Amino acid sequence: MSVCIYRGGYQMVRKSGVGKALEHQAAALKSAGLPLIDQIPPAGPEAKECVVHLNTVLPSAPLAAARAHARGCKVVYYGHSTMEDFRNSFFGSNLLAPLFKRWLIFCYRQGDVVITPSVYSRRILMGYKIGKPIYTLSNGIDTGFFHPDPARGARFRDRYGLAEGQKCVISVGHWMVRKGLPDFVELARRMPEVRFIWFGQTDEALLTDEIRKAMEAAPGNVLFAGYVGAEDLCDAYCGADAFAFLSHEETEGIVVLEALACGIPTIVRDIPVYANWLEDGKSVYKAANVNQFEAKLRDMLNGHLPSLKEGGMAVAEARSLGQIGQALCRIYASGGFLDAAMTAPAADTHTARKRA
């Protein structure tokens, strides 16, 4: 058996969570001992033993699914996107959202099975009536790369000119209302003694008026650092004093796993996607609005709240790429793609199978 992770359109999603998920799949499958191939094989015995992973909903992806099926391959379609997390993303996204949902349904129906990263996103996709088995499986986290490292932290603080004792709060994501950027700016305005740094960016042509106004009016203690690579981002997780993820809608949030793996105190918005796996006061702190974010951040930065480092790192470790690779094997076996005798002994599979 072999696996082809289809990379059509990869350059368009490389800097997004979908791009990270694609790389995580490759590493997870390698850890499970499954061979990866670069191209969908031609019709024949090799194709019949090949599983093709699709991660985007770009036009080339359903075409690749059709080509894979015609050659005898099985197709796993990853449900990273929903209409719900498409809204409030860029200029015109709310108007296009209903059409985007119809396109998602068409794409996901091209898979023999669908994998989505959370119980919450699975519930949404079940409501789309896709008609294919839908499994829940985290995108995973490379805990060998993302882990606490004081030297990395010192490098981050030196790079951004943070004096000893200077508090710093970071966030990561595209410049979107959905990602909570306006609230991040408001927090900075309320906490002028704290440095706020936002990593990530969006093409300026796609920005909404609300985002433009928020960024233009941002106080001097806010830095929009733009997109940075994994090395620099890991440095930031290791050196900042808190990670605030204010997103209003997610299917999982890989950056949350990265932060937890690095042991940084983390606060997230109290939204449904986290209900089944992030517990307030045990692995993260949660807040429902800007006032709560401000109050809890102040307490976190001043040492008035207990450290949740161990609980957060345990959440990340349970979703290490080694665990994800074994869970993928079990999904293949359930889907009839792989002899069950070849799969590893079952741990927590993070999977569920029902027809949408």
Q: Which sequence ranges carry the predicted segments?
A:
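Conserved acidic donor-binding segment of nucleotide-sugar-dependent glycosyltransferases
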Residues: D280-N291, R298-L305
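Short hydrophobic beta-strand element within catalytic cores of glycosyltransferases
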Residues: P265-V268
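Aromatic "clamp/platform" in nucleotide-sugar-dependent glycosyltransferases that forms part
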Residues: H248
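Glycosyltransferase donor-sugar binding loop
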Residues: V172, R195-E210
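Nucleotide-activated donor-binding/catalytic signature segment of Leloir-type glycosyltransferases, i.e.
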Residues: T208-E231
